[in-house]
Amino acid sequence: VKSWDVIVVGAGIIGLSLAIELRKRGASVLIVERGEPGHEASRAAGGMLVDSPLETPPVLQSLATASARMYPEFAHELELESEMKVDLRDQGAILFPDEKHFGHPAIHGQMKAHAISLLDIQQLEPELRKDESDRVELELARQESFPDNSVEEIEILFKSVRGRALYLKERSVDPRALTTAAWKTAKNRGVDFSSGDPVTAINISDDQVSGVTTIKTTFLAEKVVNCAGAWSSQLGPHPIPTRPVKGQMLCLAMHPRDLIKHVIRTPDVYLIPRSDGRLLVGATVEEAGFDKRTDPDTMKRFHQAAIELVPKLAEARILEDWAGLRPGTPDNLPILGSTSTPGYYVATGHFRDGILLAPITARLMAQVIHHEKPDYDLTPFSLSRFSPMSS
């Protein structure tokens, strides 16, 4: 009977990235996926690689920064092996902040960003809406460049007429292309796949993992990793407090293709341009169970918000809309590491950061599975933080 060194449950970007990393280390790997690889939260994601302290929980900052730095090599490797592009863009983001971005004590003294003026914004994105006072200011404005500033300095700048937004040096990637490239790479590397057959049980023999049972069959392995995202809580042997958090998204066709060049984030909506001319508008954060239906009123609101920001988008064709189910946890931080059952590991609960954290999660989990000291302390992400009995 065939067996594997490791079974990974879930073929989202986390499971795929981990399987590739394990194959690099010589392990035989089987991925068991309830549906189609990469077709749940990974496919529905926006793909903003946000590691700014303005928007990243402090305890997650080191992992987010490390993973963001890994992305060029990570994406390049997937592109080479899959012979397809993942649309990793270095365009940066324009953030129109609200008060909470400046009030969080964790970011003071850490944040490095460019405060940009109305004139800067006009030069970066000429199609952003301007009201009459903006036009007057633009006529009076003269070019001023701001160096990297601390949060305190940026806050002062924002109290002047010049400070309108922040420019953040960050990347974005196309999650659909990324997950397809990761799936192709995993197959090329010799990862085995079982799709369309949900896992119903993690099998334990003599207090040690022995494999998984699906609706159709049983697969054998001495190590199993739960990467099942929003469905992680449905697998034993330990209670895993994940829940689905719905995110709806609208997709428009820009004309011309580079109508918007940067990611644009406001307190209400974000716009994510793709190199092929698509523009993603999102996203909701909803507690709606496993319901993946989109809401017409929400799509209208997204469309109107996009037009408010960029009037020319009134002419943009609506291509599609969708919803995905992010894996949330009680503290909205991931669950990473081993458990008290030998051979059973968990890498789930990445909430809104699964795409960003895929490279570092794969590296750290591979280290844990091979009984090496991980590059970063995973104690804050241990399953045991929810209950002493659950680890």
Residue ranges of model-derived segments:
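C-terminal catalytic lobe of FAD-dependent flavoproteins
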Residues: 175, 312-391
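Glycine-rich FAD pyrophosphate-binding loop
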Residues: 23-44
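Beta1/beta-strand and adjacent pyrophosphate-binding region of the FAD-binding site
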Residues: 2-14, 30
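Active-site substrate-recognition segment that forms the wall
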Residues: 20-25, 47-49, 53, 84-89, ...
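Short beta-strand to alpha-helix junction loop
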Residues: 62-65, 99-101, 165-184, 293-298, ...
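Dinucleotide-binding Rossmann-like beta1-alpha1 core, especially the glycine-rich loop
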Residues: 47-156, 305-307
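Helical element adjacent to the flavin cofactor pocket in flavoenzyme catalytic cores
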Residues: 154, 158-160, 164-215, 219-223
